[in-house]
Structures are given as structure tokens and as C-alpha cells.
Amino acid sequence: IAADHFLAYRQSTGLMTVLAGLPWFTDWGRDTMIALTGLTLSTGRYQDARDILTTFARYIHHGMVPNMFPDEGTDPLYNTADASMWYFYAVGKYLDYTGTPEDYSFVQETIYPKLKEIIAAYEHGTDFSIYMEEDGLIHAGSGLDQVTWMDVRVGDWVATPRHGKP
């Protein structure tokens, strides 16, 4: 199956992960959460999906799902405004596909506290000037860091500025 080429065992976490596009990209939070349904759930790989959700839950920091895990095994990077929101989507899809009492317990015990942490961090403001405004929309960065999927930057020049509420 083609999905096999995107799933890999990450030695540093001891669990499965999604590779966004080797050799250029390893595991990226946004890409992983978007692809989780097609690569694991629709193919019946429920344990792989659970492992991936667990890995990203372990690394949530200041309410932010990692943007990427560097190849070198160093600390994850967190410069993304939307990976945490895609995480909610992936958890919902996981329950849609599995739905057993055991799966609900897993989410209740392992994932739900992290979802609450994400909401609280966005409400109060987190790293990279990411926060929820009074209207409920997300403010995505100050312009100093590129925190959306359109993140091209060459020196001080930003090809597609997307800060604020783009």
C-alpha cells in the first residue's frame, strides 16, 4: 500500500510517525494531522494513529503541537499557528473511525488534558504571538516569524506575509 511509504518508526519517541516528504521533510505536525485519516484510519491502522497522536501529545509545549521534529533528533520546533487546531481534527477523526470504549478512555485520559491545554494557551496567548482574539479568531504571529503553511523567508524578506488574521 502507498501509505507504507509515509509511515515510519521514530527511534527518539519509540512510536510511529508520518513522514511529510523524504528526503526533504521528516515529520511535520500540520502535515501529519491532515494526513492521519488517509494514512492510518482509512487503512485500519488504528494503533499507528494512536501512536502518532500520543507522540504529538507528549511534545505539546505552551499549547502548541510541534511544527516539526528535526532530523538530528534535537528538540522539536513549534513555529506553527494551526498544527494544534489540526490536532483537534485528527483526534475527532480517530474517534469517528474507532469509537470503542477503550478508544474513548484513551482520548479521555491521554489526549483530552492536552486539548484543554491547547485551548487555554490560545485563549491566554502562546509563543510566536499566537492567540485567540475576542472574536474567536486566531491571531497568527507578529510578522517576525512565519507561522502559517506559507512560511517562505529569505533573510529578512518574507515572500508571503501572513501574520495577524490572514
Where are these regions (language model features)?
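Acidic, mature catalytic/reactive cores of soluble proteins
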Residues: I1-P166
